[in-house]
Amino acid sequence: MRLLIGSDDSGCIKELVANRGTNTSEQSALQPLHLEAHLERGLNAKAHQMLQISDNECLLARMSGDIELVSWSREPRGGEEDKPVFEVSSFQVMATLGGLLDGEKMQELHKRSQRRAASADRFVALFALPGQPQRYFAATMSGQFHFLALADGDLKLQKTFSVRGPVEFAQLYDLEETEKLVFAYGGEDNLIKLVEVSRDLEQLEQIWEAKNVKNDRLDLKVPIWPAALRFLQPAVSPASEGLNYQFIAVTRHSHLHFYQTTHGRKPFRSVDLLPNREPTTSLEVVGDVTPLGNVKSTSFEGFSIITTDTKKSILQFEPSGHLLGKFGGSDIKGFPSYIHVQGKYLVEGGLDRYVRVFELKNRNMLLKVFAGGKVSSVLLLDVSDVELPLSKKEKNKRRHKRVLDEDQEREEDNELWAQLDGSSKRRKSKPRLDG
């Protein structure tokens, strides 16, 4: 496997090459073939978001407010006696676009925040715009929606819109082609909103806003803090005419909300995921999904979700709230701040400074490597394993087996010839009967 790891350790990215079964916490297990730091920028420029845009390019969104276009080339390594052959990468920043964060706005937003310490502005989303080659979108916690273009090897800022912050997530609807780009966003004390952006990037318009759920049993207002959202396909038999969007959202208060815009502005169903209201911070879907993780279904069934709490748990639920299982179990020792479903795998990293890869179908851990610093983001570039040369013990074992196989084959041949020879002699000695 080949991974790029965004690490808080000196604000670098690290290239990891390792096979399934690698575990740096066990001396007897396989160890990484390659782990090397690149593009160090310091702790204040750690990579919050990473996006692969081609076979040898990615975008890095850094805490410094820069988005970098990074290219890499590879050359072989190894090949000595009993050493595996694999490729390692050299990285180069090809273009940089800066000044995309707004620290002053975050100071204003902190005045109405429940957080004890002020949060620095950061990137909360970075993805490619479907159907628009070399066009990208980045969202910030302060409420900046940036639209970027890659042209002639350079990054250009096409347009920036300001929305209400703080923004914990920004999700694009990509289940079908729409006349305008449709985004959902929300955050602390910031109800979920749907906005449309014209394809020419001239206008952003809010088209829908959620309402909070009813007060709790003590008639107290339920805190507003949506943390992540995924769209579904439009309802087949909508309750009313008009705007037809469906989505699910998790909140920092461990609720899973179900929305249909034709049903109203409040969630039509709400599920408590965790009994003690531990904060849930992320949302990934396991099932038939789009490149941006939206659900290719009109039904709120037939898929599962993965979320994290702020302690150490990665939990998989049915939409009903039934717990299917946990990833990592007691192996994870700190907040799993980053998770991402990619194909058949779940990639995880966080405060305990390990990066892990799990198999979705059984939640088995395939890889665990100490990254040296808190893991902020991960790209899984390749899932194939490097062919390892045989050890002397394995070579001797195979040689011994080959000798045994040859002896057995020779013995079987001798037995077969003996049987054939015996049959021939019996036919010759058998008296002929004249009619």
From Swiss-Prot:
<comment type="subunit">
    <text>Component of the pre-66S ribosomal particle.</text>
</comment>
<comment type="function">
    <text>Involved in the biogenesis of the 60S ribosomal subunit.</text>
</comment>
<dbReference type="GO" id="GO:0005730">
    <property type="term" value="C:nucleolus"/>
</dbReference>
<feature type="compositionally biased region" description="Acidic residues">
    <location>
        <begin position="406"/>
        <end position="415"/>
    </location>
</feature>
<dbReference type="GO" id="GO:0042273">
    <property type="term" value="P:ribosomal large subunit biogenesis"/>
</dbReference>
<keyword id="KW-0690">Ribosome biogenesis</keyword>
<protein>
    <recommendedName>
        <fullName>Ribosome biogenesis protein NSA1</fullName>
    </recommendedName>
</protein>
<dbReference type="InterPro" id="IPR036322">
    <property type="entry name" value="WD40_repeat_dom_sf"/>
</dbReference>
<dbReference type="InterPro" id="IPR037379">
    <property type="entry name" value="WDR74/Nsa1"/>
</dbReference>
<comment type="similarity">
    <text>Belongs to the NSA1 family.</text>
</comment>
<feature type="region of interest" description="Disordered">
    <location>
        <begin position="394"/>
        <end position="435"/>
    </location>
</feature>
<keyword id="KW-0698">rRNA processing</keyword>
<dbReference type="GO" id="GO:0006364">
    <property type="term" value="P:rRNA processing"/>
</dbReference>
<dbReference type="GO" id="GO:0030687">
    <property type="term" value="C:preribosome, large subunit precursor"/>
</dbReference>
<feature type="compositionally biased region" description="Basic residues">
    <location>
        <begin position="425"/>
        <end position="435"/>
    </location>
</feature>
<keyword id="KW-0539">Nucleus</keyword>
